Amino acid sequence: MQCGIACIQMVCCYFGRKYSTEFISQYCHSTTEGVSLLSISETVKEIGIKTISGRVETNQLVRVILPCILHWNQNHFVVLYKVKKNRFYIADPAKGLVKYNLEEFKKHWVSTQSDGEEKGIAMFLEPTP
């Protein structure tokens, strides 16, 4: 199963919307390399979930409504579903449920560093009525 499609399925389930992999695949434009963040965003929009994506700092993830989809290791997508006491709880389509401390989390997620700021790519989601 492709990680982007699996992440879409997980967040839809969280919001009480259960869709099969086949159904999601109809909307999600996939290539041999998987799906893009744009394709994930367009797919969830089609099924009633608004998104905002961008580069954010780790400390901003503590203040947002979860779950959110993260670009992981520059080539994978995971769902961040909880942050508690500097522990980051990840639903990884390849590994299952995994817990990371701050440093481990940053190794996988941070994609840019400049002027002392470390940022990674996140997609925040909100269901529409």
Regions found by a protein language model. Give the residues of each.
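Noncatalytic regulatory segments and standalone regulatory/sensor domains
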Residues: C28-V35, L61-N73, F77-P129
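Cysteine-nucleophile protease catalytic domains, especially the papain-like/related folds used
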Residues: M1-S53, R63-L66, W72-F77
